[in-house]
């Protein structure tokens, strides 16, 4: 039998059957409940894969640390191709997942959004740095000296989500879609 694309309805039916076999009740959270679930998950993880694409159409993916403020993601970085891409195209995608070996334990979120880059002269940079302060303090404690970055080296990327898809199979949440208003 040849492979084919399944409709959303067909995929939902297959998912429901799988969850039923695992004795997990499927849940369909409201937008507000889904936002709370996603924020809770974002607050518990720290690394994400950030995907960007410039005018040349060549995608770039970078594994970076992040902090969140609600559903908004902040990334602290020194440079790289991702910044060139974001100058040409402010659309970004983020993948965050919990590594599992079983279907039952799958948990993660895929985010599409608009990215903004802030340098030291921007208000957004100071705000992002404040959000990263606990991480910097912890790192300074680990290495025993203050962290200092050369002026102009570091930037903050803020990704404001437009669409998200969330999974938390143990809770019965699968393929839960969120869209900005």
Regions found by a protein language model. Give the residues of each.
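Charged, gly/pro-rich active-site loop segments
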Residues: 1-30, 107-181
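Short, basic/aromatic recognition patches
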Residues: 23-47
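Short Pro/Gly-enriched beta-strand edge/turn motifs at strand-loop
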Residues: 44-49, 137-141
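Short beta-strand segments
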Residues: 45-79, 86, 93-98, 107
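Short acidic (Asp/Glu) patches
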Residues: 77-80, 93-99, 133-145
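Short, surface-exposed beta-strand-loop junctions and turns on beta-sheet-rich folds
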Residues: 81-84, 101, 172-174
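Short, charge-rich binding segments
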Residues: 84-86, 102-105, 148-149
């Amino acid at each position: 039998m040849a492979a084919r694309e399944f409709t959303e309805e067909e995929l939902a039916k297959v998912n429901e059957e799988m969850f039923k076999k695992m004795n997990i009740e499927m849940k369909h959270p409201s937008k507000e409940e889904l936002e709370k679930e996603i924020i809770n998950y974002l607050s518990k993880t720290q690394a994400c894969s950030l995907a960007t694409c410039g005018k040349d159409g060549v995608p770039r993916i970078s594994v970076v640390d992040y902090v969140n403020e609600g559903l908004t993601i902040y990334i602290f970085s020194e440079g790289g191709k991702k910044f060139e891409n974001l100058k040409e195209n402010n659309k970004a995608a983020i993948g965050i997942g919990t590594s599992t070996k079983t279907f039952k334990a799958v948990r993660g979120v895929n985010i599409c959004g608009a990215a903004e880059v802030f340098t030291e002269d921007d208000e957004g940079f100071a705000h992002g740095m404040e959000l990263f302060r606990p991480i910097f303090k912890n790192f300074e404690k680990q290495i025993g000296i203050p962290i200092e970055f050369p002026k102009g080296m570091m930037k903050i990327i803020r990704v404001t989500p437009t669409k998200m898809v969330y999974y938390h199979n143990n809770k019965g949440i699968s393929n839960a879609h969120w869209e900005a208003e």
